[in-house]
Structure formats: structure tokens, C-alpha cells
Amino acid sequence: MVFQGFNLVDRLTVMENVQSGRLGYISTWSAITRRYPKQDIRRAYELMERVGIAHYADTRADQLSGGERQRVGVVRALMQEPDILLADEPTASLDPKTSEQIMGLLRDLSRELKLPVLINIHNVNEAKEYTDRIVGMRYGRIIFDDKPDMLDPSAMEAIYAGSPHADRSGGPDDKAAAS
């Protein structure tokens, strides 16, 4: 999972933070002594290179910018070899330019790795620009489920203001929602 607030250990290096994504797969002794399997170190360097932070491998996390910290979080999540990557407000703590870079990175990684990415995000413009599908919910109910270019003002009104407009989900639950 990619967290809104990064959730890095500031006193650890980038590599150590990245390897924390593998803690559930290595022995306690290996974790305590920081003796990570060679294949995990190789994979970490490949991913860090891909997201542009390999040169920070030995840098403490508290020395990084917000965008660099979020990239560490992305690599840590990918080290878990997930079937789906969850991202909770991955751009909330970032400036607009860095937000675009992180959203572009998530989109590109999703396509390259053929990995679904589920992003919880409140920035509608970012959602429209960087995703292939938007699901809008209100009070736990799907109000909209379609391609970004189908998100029009009436759908936005239904999602955010709770207007009585019809459900616009277009998804498999339409019949259940309509009945």
C-alpha cells in the first residue's frame, strides 16, 4: 500500500525502508541484522532505478523531499509483489508538480507491470487525467463507475452534493442499485 503520509522510518536509509516491504517474507534474524536476500536487494535496486531514486539507496529517509519519500513508498509497496497496488491519497502531501509526477509514475507502473492500481483520491482533475476508470461513491454507495471522460457536471453533482440524479455507475450493480 502507498500511504498518504509516506509512513517511512526517518532514521533508516532508503534501502532499509524499501526492504521493510519484505519483512513478512524473511526471518526475524535477517530483519534484525539487516541481511536481506540478494534477490530482494537486486529487485529493490531495479525498482528504485525505475522510479529515479537508486542514487539515494544509502540516504536516510528524513533527508528526502516529499516526492522522493513517496517514491520510496511506491517501491516499498511493489517489493511486496502485490496482486493489486492500493494508494491512499498518494499526492495529498505533495506540491502540484510532484503530484503530477507521482500520478504519472503510478499510471506508468500499472501499465508496465500489468498491475491494477486502486487509488483513493479527492482531486478530480488528477483522477480524470491519470486513470482509466473512475468510481465515485457517496455514503458507501457507487454513484458513478465509468471512463474519466464520462464524468460530467451532473455526475459530479450526484457524487458531491447528493442530487437525486439517477445512479450513473454503468457497472454490474446497476440493477441492484436501481431496484
Language-model features: locations:
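Helical segment within the ABC ATPase nucleotide-binding domain
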Residues: E100-E112
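Conserved ABC ATPase signature
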Residues: R60-L64, E68
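Catalytic Walker B motif of ABC-type/P-loop ATPase nucleotide-binding domains
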Residues: L85-D88
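Helix N-cap at the start of a conserved alpha-helix in ABC-type nucleotide-binding domains
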Residues: P96-T98
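H-loop/switch region of ABC-family ATPase nucleotide-binding domains
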Residues: I121-H122
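Conserved ABC ATPase "signature" region
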Residues: Q19, S30-H55
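Conserved catalytic motifs of ABC-family nucleotide-binding domains
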Residues: E81
